[in-house]
């Protein structure tokens, strides 16, 4: 079995347990995400992947365990403070503002770096100098992702694959240290999935951002990930390099043997 990256750990999850009433959704989960690493959480439906994401981003309260980012205890912080610590998360469903232009949506993504709150950021950006800097930086992100041609169009009515790229650009506009992507390939066709993989690799190659993703598209996961953590029924089955994990008998059994009956997702 391969050893994890020698780079420092950015995110440390230790003995994480999450319960909903009498149901244990995650039990004693531990893993690391290292600097400039692409890590993936995989597993059948009900494995606990999204619950783990929700715990890390402080949307659900764990029963026990510890979550640290660069040594900072995230469980001692409110959900509203998480982005300022360098953690940005996308969701399975798009969360763009349809009435704003593509460029404005990306500019909103950088709101926590300034002095404006999220709501006010959609109305006024601060000083003219701040707005100009945000606009230039956001347009550069759109250019990098190949969608600068729609920068001044409203998001409403744009193709779904384009909106996925807008969402990724907006997440990066906040200059995160850790980017958490929740099923980024959902709803994309084959060509769009290939492009998405190229964009995620581009992020790793051109920035210091680490990526943690949940994804069911195994070809994408195995082609871009440095490290894979496989879950089933709220527990960690195996972790390792993509080559090691995809041939592990425990993971094969989890997908084919009905280990997706657990209620977490």
Regions found by a protein language model. Give the residues of each.
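Glycine-rich phosphate-binding loops of nucleotide-dependent enzymes
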Residues: 2-265
């Amino acid at each position: 079995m391969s050893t994890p990256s020698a780079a420092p750990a950015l995110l440390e999850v230790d003995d994480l347990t999450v319960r909903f009433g009498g149901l244990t959704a995650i039990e004693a989960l531990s893993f690391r995400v290292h600097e400039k690493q692409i890590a993936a959480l995989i597993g059948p439906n009900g494995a606990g992947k999204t619950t783990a994401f929700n715990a890390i981003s402080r949307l659900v309260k764990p029963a026990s365990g510890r979550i640290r980012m660069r040594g900072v205890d995230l469980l001692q912080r409110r959900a509203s403070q998480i982005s300022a610590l360098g953690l940005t998360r996308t969701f399975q469903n798009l969360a763009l503002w349809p009435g704003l232009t593509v460029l404005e949506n990306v500019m909103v993504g950088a709101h926590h770096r300034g002095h404006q709150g999220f709501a006010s950021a959609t109305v006024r950006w601060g000083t003219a100098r701040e707005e100009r800097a945000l606009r230039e930086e956001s347009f550069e992100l759109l250019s990098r992702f190949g969608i600068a041609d729609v920068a001044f169009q409203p998001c409403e009515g744009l193709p779904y694959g384009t909106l996925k790229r807008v969402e990724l650009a907006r997440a990066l506009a906040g200059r995160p240290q850790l980017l958490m992507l929740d099923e980024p390939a959902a709803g994309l066709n084959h060509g769009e999935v290939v492009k998405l993989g190229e964009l995620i690799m581009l992020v790793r190659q051109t920035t210091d951002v680490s990526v943690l993703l949940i994804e069911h598209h195994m070809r994408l996961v195995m082609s871009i990930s440095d490290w894979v953590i496989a879950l089933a029924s709220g527990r960690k089955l195996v972790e390792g390099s993509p080559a090691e994990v995809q041939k592990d008998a425990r993971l094969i059994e989890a997908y084919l043997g009905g280990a997706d009956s657990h209620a977490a997702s």
